[in-house]
Curated annotation (Swiss-Prot):
Listed EC numbers: 3.6.5.-
UniProt name for this protein: GTPase Obg
Subcellular location: Cytoplasm
Pfam families according to UniProt: GTP1_OBG, MMR_HSR1
Residues engaged in binding Mg(2+): S173, T193
Record's keyword terms, sorted: Cytoplasm, GTP-binding, Hydrolase, Magnesium, Metal-binding, Nucleotide-binding
Gene coding for it: obg
Annotated ranges, domain OBG-type G: 160-336
Length: 378
């Protein structure tokens, strides 16, 4: 499922350091000649495509990126130090436009691809460069050049990792607002969600995944009923589907588990009618609204038995958050494992795969047993 993620940033490269007019002054050498050094180069700003990053959310809060200026030159032929460069890591698939003109500048579509967003200014020249046969004591020097400055628009078509599936009012929007930064409209009536919502779930500073909530499906969606069929095709690109099922029932005359099983079977049938491959995609069962159930464990057991379910199952409350942390961590571990498989396949296809060093393989035949003395130990 692809959504456009955008961020506008400003990049300012560093100014080059100034050259200097200086003359050698030592004892017994009254006319030592020019020895002014050049200024250092200003810091540049680069962008590198990183397959371990999947959104541009960090750039929405860090909009200004300014590199340092180069140092000025000094006497005794000392050049100024170059300023450190700044490298911005962006997701693979990021497109960079000039924010003022709309011109397409870069398309970072391969892991490790590096481009220059703003080049640092060159350092100025010291008076050493202006010495000639007719001018033995030049006093000229040049200032450092200004670094490039740009306003850039970063655009990424985000591929959602997790798709939420379920009937209208199953609690999908409540769940995505609970676990991510998305804030969809939530109300106690069906068809609250009229367009897809995208949320980023952060489990740590360096680990995250993207969840997509689409309008709820109803019976007959594969034939055009409701709104969900308009977005079913997008779920084909997700890695795992979360099938949300409401296990509560406001009607006291209705068995909530039997109704939930019937609703779940209707969703699976719509998937099969729309696309058999989509129905075979990895799917996890999420029983929602446990806060409205007297005995969640018994409800879970009854549902699994009647639904003949053998895959992963979680019981949560999207409203108060019960059980959502376990679901989030399980999803993150699963997606990380799938990403490692994809990275390995890509490295092998590109011919860049490097096997692990056998010295770090504890299962090799000549590995020392735990607690055994190492070489050099007494």
């Amino acid at each position: 499922m692809k959504f456009v993620d955008e961020a506008t940033i400003e990049v300012i490269a560093g100014k080059g350091g100034n050259g200097v007019a200086s003359f050698r002054r030592e004892k017994f050498i009254p006319k030592g000649g020019p020895d002014g050094g050049d200024g250092g180069r200003g810091g540049s700003i680069y962008a590198v495509a990183d397959r371990n990053i999947n959104t541009l959310i960090d750039f929405r809060y860090a909009r200004l990126h300014r590199a340092k200026n180069g140092e000025n030159g000094r006497g005794s032929d000392q050049y100024g130090a170059a300023a450190p460069d700044i490298t911005l890591r962006v997701p693979v698939g990021t497109v960079v436009h000039d924010a003022d003109t709309g011109e397409l500048l870069f398309d970072l579509n391969r892991h490790g691809e590096k481009v220059t967003l703003a080049a640092g200014g060159q350092g100025g020249m010291g008076n050493l460069h202006f010495k000639s046969s007719t001018n033995r004591a030049p006093r000229q020097w040049t200032p450092g050049k200004e670094g490039e400055q740009r306003r850039l628009r970063l655009e990424l078509k985000v591929l959602a990792d997790v798709g939420l599936l379920g009937l209208p009012n199953a609690g999908k929007s409540t769940l995505i607002s609970r676990i991510s930064n998305a804030r969809p409209k939530v109300a106690d009536y069906p068809f609250t969600t009229l367009h897809p919502n995208l949320g980023v779930v952060r489990t740590s500073a360096s680990r995250s995944f993207v969840v997509a909530d689409i309008p709820g499906l109803i019976e007959g969606a594969s034939e055009g009923a409701g709104l969900g069929h308009l977005f079913l095709r997008h779920l084909a690109r997700t890695r795992v589907l979360l099938h949300l099922v409401d296990i509560s029932s406001p009607d006291p005359d209705t068995d909530p588990i039997e109704q939930a099983v019937a609703d779940a079977r209707a969703i699976v049938e719509e998937l099969r009618r729309y696309d058999p491959e989509l129905a075979d995609k990895p799917r996890w069962l999420v029983l929602n609204k446990l806060d409205m159930v007297a005995d969640p464990d018994a409800a879970r057991q009854r549902f699994v038995e009647q639904f003949s379910w053998q895959g992963p199952v979680f019981v949560i409350s999207g409203l108060n958050g019960d059980g959502t942390q376990e679901l989030i961590w399980a999803l993150q571990d699963y997606l990380d494992a799938e990403q490692r498989k994809a990275n390995l396949a890509q490295d092998q296809a590109d011919g860049t795969y490097v096997a692990e060093d056998p010295r770090f393989d504890a299962t090799r035949s000549d590995a020392a047993p735990p607690g055994a003395p190492r070489g050099g130990d007494e």
